[in-house]
Regions:
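Extended low-polarity, hydrophobic cluster-rich segments
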Residues: 24-34, 70-72, 105-108, 146, ...
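Phosphate/oxyanion-binding active-site loops and adjacent basic polyanion-contact surfaces
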Residues: 21-26, 53, 81-86
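Hydrophobic beta-strand residues in large extracellular and virion-surface proteins
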Residues: 29, 33, 42, 59-62, ...
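Acidic-basic catalytic patches of nuclease active cores, encompassing PD-(D/E)XK
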Residues: 2-49
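Catalytic cores of nucleic-acid endonucleases
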Residues: 67-145
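Surface-exposed interaction regions that form or flank ligand-binding interfaces
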Residues: 1-13, 139-156
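Active-site metal-binding core of divalent-cation-utilizing nuclease and nuclease-like domains
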Residues: 40-65
Length: 156
């Protein structure tokens, strides 16, 4: 790597600088999620069909032995995540989990560099608790908030 590349990596991952388009935040989130799943394949902007037949474009998907293990979304810019955002996230995760390719899906992670509104967190927790608690339907919903140069993850 040349000096420019090393300086850019330092700005993104050490200094945690932000850029207008939110790309640096996305890189940090992708690196964070990939670090949670060792020996797994990390796929970016993956199209995954749900039970509904709709193809969902997932920003980051984790595969192990050809099966999806986790999906993750991140909001890098704009306003804090609201209840409508988490409802859409839940619907996508539920549709993928219920589909042919989601049978081994265990985690759905919603990351944010702009925060979560209180009603959004409550809404996602309620949706998560409304799921059947059997092994076939189990899906862990997690939020990852990036603040003070670190991610804090909360299971909903």
């Amino acid at each position: 790597m040349n000096d420019d590349a090393l300086e850019l990596l330092n700005r993104i991952f050490v200094d945690c600088e932000e850029d207008k388009k939110g790309k640096y935040a996305q890189y940090r989130f992708f690196a964070y999620v990939s670090s949670m799943y060792h020996k797994c394949e990390v796929l970016i902007n993956e199209s995954i069909p749900g039970k509904s037949g709709k193809e969902h474009k997932v920003p980051i998907a984790i595969k192990s032995n050809g099966m999806y293990m986790a999906i993750a979304f991140n909001k890098a810019t704009g306003n804090a995540i609201n209840k409508k955002d988490v409802e859409k996230f839940y619907q996508i995760a539920d549709d993928v989990k219920s589909g042919e390719h989601g049978t081994q899906l265990i985690d759905a992670i919603y990351g944010s560099s702009v925060g979560f509104k209180g009603d959004a967190l409550i809404g996602l927790e309620e949706l998560s608790k409304s799921r059947k608690d059997d092994a076939e339907n189990k899906l862990e919903f997690k939020t990852a908030n990036f603040e003070n140069r670190i991610y804090s993850v909360v299971k909903c």
